[in-house]
Amino acid sequence: IAAKQLTGKPLVVHMHATSYDRASDDQVDTRVVDLETKGMMAADKVMAVSELTRNICINRYGIDPDKVVAVHNAVDFSGREKLEVERNVKEKVVTFLGRVTYQKGPEYFIEAAAKVLKRCNNVRFVMAGSGDMLNRCIRHVARLGISDRFHFTGFLRGKEVHKMFALSDVYVMPSISEPFGISPLEAMQTNVPSIISKQSGCAEILSYALKVDF
């Protein structure tokens, strides 16, 4: 805002996520909401990563619809080398990869895993990532008695992420609210099918992904 005032140049705000994505309504930090509102109100244009985020900007923050546009995220499919990985497990691998936080819905993934394992034992579940709910999720898995089929990798980066996708048979993104969600596109790079939340921006463009209410 100060740069706009100083230079007289137009201000464009790129909204990757909002406070309403990161927390439930009763947990939203109103101080952050005020800052987000101030920034978007001062902007000449607001770029949202999805129609979902665009609607939040308009309906929750009162931003003029005429200045909010949706521009979806993307990944570069060119130049990605195919990873050859050795699988040391014979079971199918179902993966959650992301921050282990309220927004990402990790406990829905755990509950789904428990239900699947009651019907089918030929599958392993992997939760790749770290976050403030990690220890809670580890205890949850132990309480459900599925620790022998459920694995926690911790935080992954770079080639570790691509290797994890290459080892996976299915990727699951059970987010409660996901402004876009780039990981299903990354899974597509290794030909891994995805089950994604309907409450996500990428659901607007991934017509062949299985979409679920979490």
Show the residue positions of the predicted features:
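Nucleotide-sugar donor phosphate/pyrophosphate-binding loop at the beta->alpha transition
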Residues: 7-12, 20-38, 58, 77
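Short hydrophobic beta-strand element within catalytic cores of glycosyltransferases
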Residues: 193-196
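Carbohydrate-associated surface elements
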Residues: 52, 74
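Nucleotide-activated donor-binding/catalytic signature segment of Leloir-type glycosyltransferases, i.e.
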Residues: 138-156
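Aromatic "clamp/platform" in nucleotide-sugar-dependent glycosyltransferases that forms part
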Residues: 176
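Conserved donor-binding/catalytic core segment of Leloir-type glycosyltransferases
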Residues: 47, 88-113, 126
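Short alpha-helical donor nucleotide-sugar binding micro-motif in glycosyltransferases
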Residues: 155-156, 163-168
